[in-house]
Swiss-Prot record:
GO MF, one example: lipid transporter activity
List of residues binding ATP: 565-572
ABC transporter domain ranges (all copies): 531-762
A cellular-component GO term for this protein: intracellular membrane-bounded organelle
PROSITE patterns: ABC_TRANSPORTER_1 (PS00211), ABC_TRANSPORTER_2 (PS50893)
The species this protein was found in: Dictyostelium discoideum
Keywords associated with the record: ATP-binding, Membrane, Nucleotide-binding, Transmembrane, Transmembrane helix, Transport
Presence of keyword Ribonucleoprotein: no
Major location category of this protein: membrane
Protein name: ABC transporter A family member 9
Classification via CDD domains: ABC_subfamily_A
Membrane association type: Multi-pass membrane protein
Keyword Membrane: yes
SUPFAM superfamilies reported in the protein's UniProt record: P-loop containing nucleoside triphosphate hydrolases
Amino acid sequence: MWGASDKKYKSNQFRAMFFKNATFIKRQKCSLCVQISIPLILVIILVIVNFWVKSQIGSLQTNGGKLMNSTSTYQYNSLTFGYMLSVNENNITEIGYKDSDGSGSGLLNYTPQLYIPAFKAYTPFFVPFASVENMDDKILAMKENATFESLSSETLPLSALIFNDFNVNNRSLDYTIQCEEQSRYSFYPYEAFVAFSMNTMTTTILNYFLGGNGTIYKSNIATLPYYQQSTTIDIASLLGGSFYPFALSFIMPLFIYSIVYEKQEKLRDLSLMMGLKIRNYWFMTYIFNFLIYFIIIVFVVGVSSIFGFAVFVKGSQFAMFLFLFAWGNSMITFSFFLSTFFKKTRAASIFGYFLVIIAVNLNSILSYQVFKDSTPPVPYYWIPLLAFYRGMSQLSTQCGIDLCPEWSAYTWEFEMSKIIFWLYIDAIVYLLIALYLDQVLPREFGVPSHPLFFLKPILNLFKNKDNDKSNTINGGSGGGRRFSETSSLINSADFDVENNNGEQEIVEDEDVLEEKEMIINRRYDPNEMTVIIEGLTKHYVGRPKPSVDNLYLSVRKGEVLGFLGANGAGKTTTISMLTGLYTPTSGTAHVAGLDIRYDMDNIHHVIGVAMQFDIFWEDLSCVETLLYFTRLKGVPPEREIQSVESILKEVNLFEVKERLVKELSGGMKRRLSFAVAMTGDSSIIFLDEPSTGISSELRRDLWRTINDLKKNRSIILTTHSMEEADVLSSRIAIISQGKLQCIGTQNHLKAKFGDGYSVRINVEEPYINTHNPTELITKFSPQAVLTESFDGSYNYRFPKNTVISDLYQYLVSHKYDHHLQEWSFSQTSLEDVFLKISANDDTIN
């Protein structure tokens, strides 16, 4: 019944996309090699730099592996000329002073000094300060003005002594030692100054209480005995913090490019119209992007491991796997997210590379300047690029100094654990946001979904059953199933089709009314019908009028329906609903006996679409292109090749089946578009402007191909060429402002809406300027009107009641006396009918 095929094909969408993508990548070998070579070149540069640095500075290893003698560590014998600072805030009189000339008093007078002839002074001596604040200000000022040449004990103090308490009776001294720790301001270790200061004060107090200067106290500072192993500094890992972020993220702009390219070239739209599910599109795109990323990871990690870079061969291998796996997933979903904002590949590519370069440098500044000794705030990890770059930098730095973290170190307090966690969260969140934005953002082709589209299934569950019944459409294979259009939040601007927004109903043409009554009353043979449209309506939110308004239309087997209308009249919206791109606001349609509201999956198996412009992957061959769409339609694998070859023969492309699409001529590409529409035993084909941009010679050839196609199929043809519609169509349907205005054969419409006949008369060349046939014509028919005249050629419009045979005899009888060279008769053209029907269409006006 309905002419539907008994074959129930199961769509092989994953298989179709897998082989298409795999073949496309195989053809893009150069591009793939470049994608892999860029990170590989960066790693090779890292290897070269590593060898060069090691050759310049030699082995960066200490003499380890032996028992260190603790008593030889930080020994102090003597220091060069210098001075010490003393602070006596409590004004303890017994502290005294010690000057560079050897004079002194109190406790400090017993400090042992050494005379330096070169300076003509004794060392060490004390410079007193009244408070710690004054001393600090002085030291900071000296450091601010210090140069490399002045960094010595001659300008900066050896140490500072802060005296807190001195009790002579109890023989107790409480003091604090302050020594220089910053290496740029000192040529000796910090411990050496501490030992010197302690020795000096111990000797001083002993001499003070013993009453003489003969006592010398010496002590050393040392560690306990230990085995010191060789500490390897991995230059490659240290530098990897800058190289690896570039190497492992340079592929992201290409991910963005590939998605935007398929949107820009309408490849995704065509695939969706041919039955591809958007979820399957994203899933397979995800899989192939991750496959490319995996190949790059294998090369980068493999080369790095061969040369023993610590970041990949030491530490926790499982943690590194989790880290790289998290980055791959988050990078792909982040590229999905970014792709939703672009319509052109050029802008997408420039932005992608710019973002990678900026993010790497921004992370370097923030990680090593702002967050060097602290953890960044949580929002820092919400940008996958920054999170990955910081993690890679930290691992590279730690592994570079032989401190690669083991698995036991990955607690929540360890920042790398947080980075890995947030990368997985980023992957999920950006995927959901990308899928949402892809549906709701404005697009170049098609209409975006309502921002709350995801609530439709929930609202449908709570829809009142009585409202469901009010929209029930019985008949066909729908079996009386109810259809309910979601209202309230999502379609608050929906309208009442019956009263047409309160406007006065326009009186329908009798042919349109007859078509409508035939469909409503089921006065047709279902076996002869391939498409039945029943009250189909589409009203976009925010627009005052529906794009398609209560449309009733039928298409028979073997019929070519010329579906005409001005731009914006509703043609594309109607076809988009029939092919499943849009859902109707109300009404329905049956395609091959299947309801577009419920059975779109099966409908896609029996329909084909040839869009206005040739839409192909240029690097696929004719066979590979058709195999992709054949698999989308669900043709069994054992029949794929046979089906494709049969279609290629039907459109005369079998001899060039292995030729790449980019090598085909314009006419061949157009025929390949028809072949795409025929895949999967399509019984209904939609042709959108089939001969646009084609030469007149190729156009005639394409028309012959279309006439051959209609033998076993129904075709719905949209075109702006009235000649094309006149030649190809079995019937013409003209739509204006969303409503069907007229329907019938070409001759019927010309006779019904035409203004009569058109007659063109040419005057003999010698008499062009002296003879005008207008007076002769008006004598025959006073109602005749001159519509055009140029260079001896005159065109007249005659009323419908004109007897053409009488006019012909009249012109023959006056041919010689009025010097008439030739004349021709024509009925009102289809273009005249179209312009007359569409005269009130505001899309034209």
